[in-house]
UniProtKB/Swiss-Prot annotation:
Its EC number is 3.6.5.3. Residues 5-217 form the tr-type G domain. It holds the Pfam family GTP_EFTU. Residues 144-147 are annotated as: G4. It catalyses: GTP + H2O = GDP + phosphate + H(+). It comes from Pyrococcus furiosus (strain ATCC 43587 / DSM 3638 / JCM 8422 / Vc1). It is found in: Cytoplasm. It is an enzyme of class 3 (hydrolase). Residues 14-21 are annotated as: G1. GTP hydrolase that promotes the GTP-dependent binding of aminoacyl-tRNA to the A-site of ribosomes during protein biosynthesis. Keywords: Cytoplasm, Elongation factor, GTP-binding, Hydrolase, Magnesium, Metal-binding, Nucleotide-binding, Protein biosynthesis. Mg(2+) binds at S21. InterPro entries: EFTu-like_2, G_TR_CS, GTP-eEF1A_C, P-loop_NTPase, Small_GTP-bd, T_Tr_GTP-bd_dom, TRAFAC_GTPase_members, Transl_B-barrel_sf. This is Elongation factor 1-alpha.
Length: 428
């Protein structure tokens, strides 16, 4: 039986109006994956007999977006010869960042779209920095709107140099830079004859070569809990996605911060594991599972708890502890000062946190300190801060278990900042 092709999740990033949606639209259009609802609309409007034009599809997609309906993300899947690709999101969604951090959909790669006309713009930098903060390892650069610069090689090389400088500064290496015109369909799926000077991959060929995501099986077991069910005749069944490590039937797991909150170990033996209603002996990273735990009641645990082995339990940050984090402020109406208390979203947990100290302001591009102990930080700033949770929460330093070290800061219905945990300081 042929081994299944690897599944790869990608996000599209880049400055507003540089052509992210058009590029996604072109990929779907040229691979025959236009969302159902668009095709339906086409038929309803009696457009039969007319050809199903790309421009028409893009207008419909744009209308849907303006009405606040983003095309159902589940539809944005397509295949390349060696990969199943899911486009999990594109910025512009209000919850883009939160989804990328807390969603079940950690991106494996990002496509950075840069217009040949403008070159690197402020949001290009912000999104690239964000990709790094969110731990996206692979980047593909699409230099779009080549039709607007007459497919000029010199202009392509100029913009390519700008992007390379930015990404190398952020620590990215070995990324393809592809000249495309999403609107004209050049070098997206079909190889372009307008740019004979370019002999690298098309966008879809580059997507086909994204390295297969590694499964972090050697890290300690961590399963953030999404829900807890009580099933007659079975018992308590927590449900969650294995982020790291592996879980076998018969092992003993402990739940945190539940154990810390109740001042007693909330733990038990795993009697069974199920995935998609099939029994499993062993669960691996990426598996969405339900598992039955002996001696743990439904009221002991809840969404936001994390299961781990008793030999290496999840790390709890208590209310007397603090943690040091690197954040990037994405969207704050005024400025963040010490004492600010928004909500932290990490894995499946949500807890209020307080900004205890602003240690340093960083240059978002280089990560170098530009100001020690700033009075405030505002939109666009990167900073090192000390945060204190107002309720116990499981967090891990990003160097140790990155899946549990990234977080979003939310307030007033929007994502204020994204960040990663550098270290945890124990209070007495």
């Amino acid at each position: 039986m042929p081994k299944d092709k690897p599944h790869v999740n990608i996000v599209f990033i880049g400055h507003v109006d540089h052509g992210k949606s058009t590029t996604i639209g072109r990929l779907l259009y040229d691979t025959g994956n236009i969302p159902e609802q668009i095709i339906k609309k086409f038929e309803e409007m009696g457009e039969k007999g007319k050809s199903f034009k790309f421009a028409w599809v893009m207008d419909r997609l744009k209308e849907e977006r303006e009405r606040g309906i983003t095309i159902d993300v589940a539809h944005t899947k397509f295949e390349t010869p060696h990969r199943y690709i899911t486009i999990i999101d594109a910025p512009g969604h209000r919850d883009f960042v939160k989804n990328m951090i807390t969603g079940a959909s950690q991106a494996d790669a990002a496509v950075l779209v840069v217009a040949a006309t403008d070159g690197v713009m402020p949001q290009t930098k912000e999104h690239a920095f964000l990709a790094r903060t969110l731990g996206i390892k692979h980047i593909i650069v699409a230099i779009n709107k080549m039709d607007m610069v007459n497919y000029n090689q010199k202009r392509f090389e100029e913009v390519k140099a700008q992007v390379e400088k930015l990404l190398k500064m952020l620590g990215y290496k070995d990324f393809p830079v592809i000249p495309i015109s999403a609107w004209e369909g050049e070098n997206v799926v079909k190889k372009s004859d307008k740019m004979p000077w370019y002999n690298g991959p098309t966008l879809i060929e580059a997507l086909d070569q994204i390295p297969e995501p590694e499964k972090p099986v050697d890290k300690p077991l961590r399963i953030p809990i999404q829900d807890v069910y009580s099933i007659k005749g079975v018992g308590t069944v927590p449900v969650g996605r294995v982020e790291t490590g592996k879980l076998r039937v018969g092992e003993v797991v402990i739940f945190e911060p539940a154990s810390t909150i109740f001042h007693k170990p909330i733990q038990g033996e795993v009697k069974s594991i199920e995935m998609h209603h099939e029994p499993l002996e062993e669960a691996l990273p990426g598996d969405n599972i339900g598992f039955n735990v002996r001696g743990v009641s439904k009221n002991d645990i809840k969404r936001g708890d994390v299961a781990g082995h008793t030999t290496n339990p999840p790390t709890v940050v208590r209310t007397k502890d603090t943690f040091k984090a690197q954040i990037i402020v994405l969207n704050h109406p005024t400025a963040i000062t010490v004492g600010y208390s928004p909500v932290l979203h990490a894995h499946t947990a949500q807890v209020p946190v307080r900004f205890e100290q602003l240690l340093a302001k960083l240059d978002p591009k280089t990560g170098n300190i530009v100001e020690e102990n700033p009075q405030f930080i505002k939109t666009g700033d990167a900073a090192i801060v000390i945060l204190r949770p107002m309720k116990p929460v499981v967090l891990e330093p990003v160097k140790e278990i990155p899946q549990l070290g990234r977080f979003a800061i939310r307030d007033m219905g929007m994502t204020i900042a994204a960040g990663m945990v550098i270290s945890i300081q124990r209070g007495e």
